[in-house]
Amino acid sequence: MTRPNRSTIPACEPSSLKPDLGEIELISAPEKIFDASKFTSFLNICYSNTSDLKSFRDAIVVELRRIRKAGMIEIDNSFTKNPLSAEQVIRSYTWLTDSIIKSVWHICKIWLHPVPNPTQAEKLSIIAVGGYGRKEMAPYSDVDLLFLTPYKTTPWAESVIESILYILWDLKLKIGHSSRSISDCLRLGKEDYTIRTALLEQRFVDGDHATAKELEMRLWKDLFKLTAKDFISAKLEERDLRHEKQGGQRYMVEPNVKEGKGGLRDLQSLFWIAKYLHHVKEQSELVDLGMLRKEEFVKFQKAENFLWAVRCHLHILTNRASDQLSFDLQVETAERMGYQDSKGRRAVEVFMQDYFTHATRVGDITRIFLTALEAQHVKEMPLLQRIFRRIPQIKDPYTVLQNRLSVKSFDAFLEDKLNLLRLFEEALRTGLLIHPDAMRAVSANISLFDHDMRQNKEAQRIFMDLLIKHGNPERALRRMNELGALAAFIPEFQPIVAMMQFNMYHSYTVDEHTIQCISHLAQIEREELIEELPIASSILKSGANKRILYTSLLLHDIGKGQNEDHSVLGARIARKVAPRLGLNKKEVETVEWLIRYHLLMSDMAQKRDIADPRTVRDFAKAVQTVNRLDLLTVLTVCDIRGVGPNTWNNWKAVLIRALYRQTKKVLENGYEALTRDCLLYTSPSPRDRVQ
C-alpha cells in the first residue's frame, strides 16, 4: 500500500477538523476535548515520517484512540464536578465524535483515497442521524451515520466509506451505518417509519454540502409534506407498544431512563411530531407556536436535563450503554449526582423521588401535547363507528370536545372551585378522557384546593363518590395524582408522591402502589376475581363498608418515609384525614385501626405457624370482631396484590384463607373451639412453600 507523492498532497488545516460550535456550550474548553491544531500537526508530521499508507493509518488509529480516551476522561472529570450539567455533557460527546469523524473523513479524502478532480458522481456527504443527529449523545451511545451520494455509490465512494468505517471500528465506536443515494432515502423513508424518523433528525457533518442540502429539500418536499396524520398515528402507536414492553407504568422502581414511561423517548417523540408538523429546529419554538406554554416548556427542559444527567451517569458507571436504573446502580447514581441523606431518608430514596417527579412531569407534558395533536391530526374514526358510537349525556358546565371531556367556559367553570373535583367524577361517570385544556386548567389552579374546599361537605361527598360510586376510582385518582390535585386535596398525601421504596419487594412507588391497591379492590367489587379471591369477593358482596375499605387503602401507607413506624404514624394521620373525607366517628375509628394493623394478618399468616392454636388465638384477640376480620382480610389481599404483578401466589392465598376461616370460627364460637385437633389446616410442606 504505497502512498502518493507528498508534493501532490495538500497539508491538512486545523479548521477543516473543527466542528462548528455555534451557540453550543461544552462542559469543558473545546481544545481540552479535542485539540484540532495538535492533531493536524501530528497528521502532517506523521505523513512525512511514514513510508507507506498502512503504517500511516496504523499510527493514526493509535493517536485517535489516545485522543478519544483523553477527551472522554476530560468530559467525565468535568461532569463529576458539575453532575447536573447534562446538556453541556451530551453536546460535548457529540463535539468529540464530530471531531473524530471529520478527522477520519479528511484523512481518507486527502491521503488514503485522493481524487484530484472528482466528478459529480464522486461526491459523498456524511450525515449524522438519530440521537447523534440531534447532538444528543451519552458516553456509549451509538453513532448512526448515513453516507449519502447524489446517485449510485461509485467504487471510489465505496472505498472511502470502507476505510472510514474500519478506522471507526478500530477506535471501538459502535457504528450504525447505511450508504444510500437521495432517491434511496426517499423510497425507504416512505416504507419504514423508523428510517423516516432517523431522516427527520439528519444533520450534515462533513463532505459535500450541496448533496446534503438536496436531501433536506427533497425530504420536506417529497416525503414529510402532507403525511403528518400517518406519522403521528405511527408515533403514538409506537409509544404505546414501547410503554407496554417496559411494564406500562411510570412508577416502576427500576425504570428504563430512555425507553420507559416518562423517559427520554417520550420527550423525543413530542419533538419529532412538532418538527414533522411545523419544521421546527429548536425546542424553544414549541412555545412560539403555542404548542407548549412557557411554564410547561420550563418543566420540559428541567425534566430532559435531569433524565440526560441520569443516563450519562449510568453509562459512566457501567462503562457501556446502560439505560436501566436498576437497584444496584441507583445508590451510585445518587452519589454521583450529589444527593445526600436527608431527614431520615437515604440519599437514594430522595434521588428516586426526584426521578419519578420528573417522570410525572414528562407524562403531564407529553399527554397534554400528544393528546391535543392526536385529536387534531390523526385520521377520523370510520363513519359507521362514529354513527353507532354511544354519546354520553354531559352535565353543565361540561362539553365533549374532540371526543374528550372539556368545559364550555373556563371562566364560568372556575367561579365554583368545586368544579375542579367534579371534573374527575364526570370523567368517571361518562367514561370519557379529560381534554388537555381541562387538565391544564386543573394544574394552573391547584391553589383553589384550599382549606375551605377540604372542609366543604359537598367536596367531601364528591371525593367519596369518586371512590365508591363508579366502580373504577383508580382512573380518577391516577389522573388527580399526576396533575397534583390529589395531594392538594389531601396534603398529607404529598410526602408519598413519587416516593421510592428501596427494596426488591416493591415494584412501584408508594403512591402508585396505593392506586394499584385501590384498583384491585375495585376489581373485587366488580366481581371480576370471584374464582381467584372467593373470600374477599364474598365479603364485598355481603355488604362490607366500602367507605371504610377505600379510605383505608388510600391512606394505609401515608405514614411512610418518616422516622417512625409507618403503621403507627399512618393511623394518627388517618385520624385527622378520614373525617375530612366525610366519615363518621365510628368509621374513622375503624379506619384508624385498620391502618395501624394493616400488616398484622400478612405477618401472622406468613411468619408464624397458623397450625399452632396460639397464632390464631393471638390474632383473634387483636382483631376482636368478625367485621374487623372481614375488612382486614380484604385490605390485606389488596395490599399484597398491589405490591407487584407476581407477589400474590397460591401459597399466600392458602395461608390467608386458612387464617381467616380459623379466626372467624373462634370469633363466632369462642376460644374453646380452638384446639390443634380441630384445626383443619396444616402447615405447608417445604415443597409447597417453594411452589
Regions found by a protein language model. Give the residues of each.
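Single conserved hydrophobic/aromatic residue that forms the stacking wall/gate
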Residues: Y681-Q691
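Divalent metal-dependent catalytic cores for phosphoryl transfer on phosphate-bearing substrates
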Residues: R134-V160, D288, F300-K302, F306-W308, ...
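Hard-cation-handling environments
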Residues: G670, L674-S683
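Acidic/histidine metal-binding catalytic segments
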Residues: W111-E122, S178, H435-A438, R479, ...
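Structural motif corresponding to the C-terminal cap of alpha-helices
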Residues: C108, L112, G431, E525-L529, ...
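Non-catalytic interface/linker regions that flank or bridge core catalytic/transmembrane domains
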Residues: T2-A128, K135-M137, S141-H506, R575
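Proline-centered turn/helix-capping motifs that create local helix->coil transitions or kinks
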Residues: G484-P491, Q523-I530, M604
